[in-house]
Amino acid sequence: MIGYIKDAIQSGLYQDFWGEDSLLVDGFHECYGEQLTCEGFSAYPSSTDDNVVYVDIGGDSVHRFKITIEGV
């Protein structure tokens, strides 16, 4: 199930990014004062941990976020 959740998170992030009123684009501009472009955004699964999705935001100065999915 974790694989499906990871796929949904990645898909949702990309859908928001390409959407007309993107929370990611607005948030990036508000936090960093820059325009987020397609070259500056990536969401991908970890190559070493099946429960992790990484999100890289920002061109040259990448801000990396780690999303960990755990069952309870």
Task: Enumerate the predicted regions with their spans.
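Acidic, low-complexity, intrinsically disordered interaction modules
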Residues: 13-64
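Acidic, low-complexity intrinsically disordered segments
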Residues: 2-9, 13, 18
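Short acidic DE-rich linear segments
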Residues: 71-72
